[in-house]
Structures are given as structure tokens and as C-alpha cells.
Amino acid sequence: AVFGNVTIPLREDLSLFLGGRYSVLDKPYNYIGSTNALGAPLVFAPFTTSSGSTLKEFDPKITLEKTFDNALGWVTYTTATKSGGPGFAQWNAADASKPYEAEELEMIEFGYKAVLNDGATQVEAILYTYDYTDHQQILVGTNSQGQPAGVVVNGDATINGVELSYRTYLNENTNLALSYAGIDAEWDRFMDPRTTPSTDRAGEKMAFAPENSINLALENVQYLNIGELTSAISIVYKDKYKLALVDWEPTTVDDLTLVNLTVGLDTPSGWNISAFCNNCTDDEYKMVALSGVRAQGGGNRYGFGDGRRIGLQLSTDF
């Protein structure tokens, strides 16, 4: 890969950033399947195949940046590429010799950041749009023999979002941070091959994309004779989102609110004594989910996030 950039001052308060990266991604591979039970799933017979993918790509980055008295505004255009490659869990030479397609991304971002109240307050706002072509999705599907196998499906998607943040000192000991993220992530083209016939998921929401997320953090520091006492609370809220392509109960996370508390004392002698409570409301929520292949009987596997955890910690540096 070769990359470079230059910043061109247009005016005292206006500059243009031009950058680019040219890369050649070559992925040759050998795929070997072996078995000690001929004719039995999943590898019916031993095989060896060789294939690969080559990608030559130039990705530019252009940013126009304007400074104000206590603020900064910018607009950025950039592209990115993720190369294709060998599939996973392939049980025959025909399937193993087919690499999946490269993924392309085109992004536009508008941003504004300001420092207020003599540096005590900072606000930031970002608007962005991501345009994906051949976005890679790793699924569990079936091969030509109807056996479960790894599938990488490429689809087009558009993600539009807004991020707002506000950070300030309420007084010399207490700081507050508040942020909001809104996301509209939707498939423009996606054929799900795991059903018969395949399911067209164009217009459906993407996974791991709650439409609204809010983060609140409050921290207070007291300087005592026995050391520095820090107390903090953080609250995270996300509205309903899904963990997989299919939006149904085993793969859906309902409105989620997580509350964490910490109190810690740093002593002059270098010791830290802290107490913590993570997920204090003991919300039950899924972290990951995997939908089985319906042709193989379906089923789901999912893992939960940590429940309420309360503890004490003693540490020192030496």
C-alpha cells in the first residue's frame, strides 16, 4: 500500500485536506478438506483446491475545514474497501474455490465542534451517511448438498446517522457528559439464501443498529486528606434492535438501560480502593445470537450479557 496527504491553506480560517491510499490486496489460498468417514457429512470425500482474490483500489479522503473563534466545522468525503476472500466451513472443492466479493464504502460526514465557557464546556455534532456496496455478511447457510456451511453474502446498504455530544464542568469537582446517537441503517439489496425460496430483505433494518442511543455520565472528584475520592455513575440507553438479520424474539433486544456505579479512593501511598456495581438494575439482555439453518431444523444460539456485578477492588502500582 502507498498513501499520502497534503493540507492546503485556502484562507487563514479555511483549509483543504487531500489524501489518498492505493493498495493491492492479493489473497491466494489453499483449501483442504479431510475425513476419516467417506460418504458421511460433512466432508463426503477429501479434497484440495486453490483459488484467491486480487483487489487493486484507490481510496481518497477530502476534508474542507473551517475554524471560528472557538469552534471548528468540517465536511469530509472518503471511500474504503474490504477485500474478498475464502469462505469458511466449506465441505467440497466447488464451494471452497469461490471467494466472496470485496466490500466498498462511500462516506460523507459533516461535523461541528465548539468550546464554550472558557474551555469548561464542549459541544459536538456530526451528521454522516454511509453507502455500502457488496457489504459482507457472515451467515450459517447450506451448501449445494443441503449441508450446513458458512456463507458470506454481499448486499447493498445505506446508513444515515447523527451524533450529538455535550461535555461540561458543573463545578470545579463535577463533570457531566451527555451524548446521543441516531441511526437509520437499512438494506437496499440483500437476498437471504438460508430460506427456500430465498428471502428478499431489501428495506429491512440492519443488525446491531438501535435507532436511538443515549449515554449519560456524571463524575465527582473530592480531594481529601486521605486521598482523592472519585464517584461516578453512567447510564446507557438503547431502544429496540436486533442481533441478526431476522427480527424475532430469540434475536431481538428490547429497550435496554444499563446503570453502572463506581466509587474509588486513590491514597497518597499509591493504593487504590474501589467499589463498583455494573448493571445495577440487573437487566437481562442478549449480547450475541446465531440463527440455525431452517432447512436443517432451525434453532437459535445466543449468549447473554453480564448480570448485576457488585465488588470491591484493591490495587497498587510498584
Regions found by a protein language model. Name each.
Residues 13-16, 70-73, 118-123, 173-176, ...:
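Repeated loop/turn-to-beta-strand initiation elements of outer-membrane beta-barrel proteins
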